[in-house]
């Protein structure tokens, strides 16, 4: 029988077993519903983390300068095509509409990593500056994969307990808000687990959140 612990205990266990490098903290949500592949949510984290890829024309590249943002056009696409691991560590990618057809060259690299820009979530836009500013301000979005599981990175162990705990709480509340009004939470979410890059996962008592 699997052990289920409080969110506080789960995060503290990850922090206690942390390695020397700044591991990411990931959450996996399993749903009961057969329609879970359609679940998605957009929300805002209190504490931002991660890096952003931006595919756009040169005039748009100088609008928002930040160390967490990498801009580029076709030359960036070729860099990623030549070195797949280039995208490691990036959390989101944005694109201007004219660039979308060109991204087909690296769709097989971006897609499995959840980095293919999606217009449904405002990631394909002419207003690159506004989209970048929103993400750096904490905007986050997640959707279930083909297996009906929602994976989310809520931060890095270097952020410390308090920031991770608050990001985790906001993420869970945003997921819970996608529940139909006539369905109880325990009939909607099957399980929620947290894990770090090198650590074991812990199942969380999400009903106590």
Curated annotation (Swiss-Prot):
The keyword Disulfide bond does not apply. Gene3D superfamilies: 3.30.190.20, 3.40.50.790. The keyword RNA-binding applies. GO terms for biological process: regulation of translation; translation. Keywords: Repressor, Ribonucleoprotein, Ribosomal protein, RNA-binding, rRNA-binding, Translation regulation, tRNA-binding. This is Large ribosomal subunit protein uL1. It comes from Neorickettsia sennetsu (strain ATCC VR-367 / Miyayama). GO terms for cellular component: large ribosomal subunit. Binds directly to 23S rRNA. The L1 stalk is quite mobile in the ribosome, and is involved in E site tRNA release. Protein L1 is also a translational repressor protein, it controls the translation of the L11 operon by binding to its mRNA. InterPro entries: Ribosomal_uL1, Ribosomal_uL1-like, Ribosomal_uL1/biogenesis, Ribosomal_uL1_3-a/b-sand, Ribosomal_uL1_CS. It holds the Pfam family Ribosomal_L1. GO terms for molecular function: rRNA binding; structural constituent of ribosome; tRNA binding. Part of the 50S ribosomal subunit. Belongs to the universal ribosomal protein uL1 family. It comes from the Bacteria.
């Amino acid at each position: 029988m699997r052990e289920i612990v409080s969110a506080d205990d789960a995060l503290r266990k990850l922090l206690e077993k942390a390695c020397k490098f700044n591991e990411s903290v990931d959450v996996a949500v399993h749903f009961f519903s057969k329609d879970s592949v359609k679940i998605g949510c957009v929300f805002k984290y209190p504490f931002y983390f991660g890096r952003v890829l931006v595919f756009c024309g040169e005039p748009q590249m100088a609008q928002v300068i930040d160390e967490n943002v990498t801009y580029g056009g076709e030359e960036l696409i070729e860099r990623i095509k030549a070195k797949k691991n280039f995208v490691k560590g990036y959390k989101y990618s944005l694109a201007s509409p004219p660039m979308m057809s060109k991204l087909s060259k690296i769709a097989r690299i971006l897609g499995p990593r959840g980095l293919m820009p999606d217009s449904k979530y405002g990631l394909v836009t002419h207003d690159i500056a506004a989209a970048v500013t929103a993400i750096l301000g904490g905007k986050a979005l997640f959707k279930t994969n083909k297996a009906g599981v929602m994976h989310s990175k809520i931060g890095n162990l270097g952020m410390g307990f308090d920031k991770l705990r608050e990001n985790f709480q906001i993420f869970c509340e945003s997921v819970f808000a996608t529940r139909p009004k006539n369905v109880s939470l325990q009939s909607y979410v099957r399980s929620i687990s947290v894990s770090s890059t090198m650590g074991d996962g812990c199942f969380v008592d999400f009903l106590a959140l």
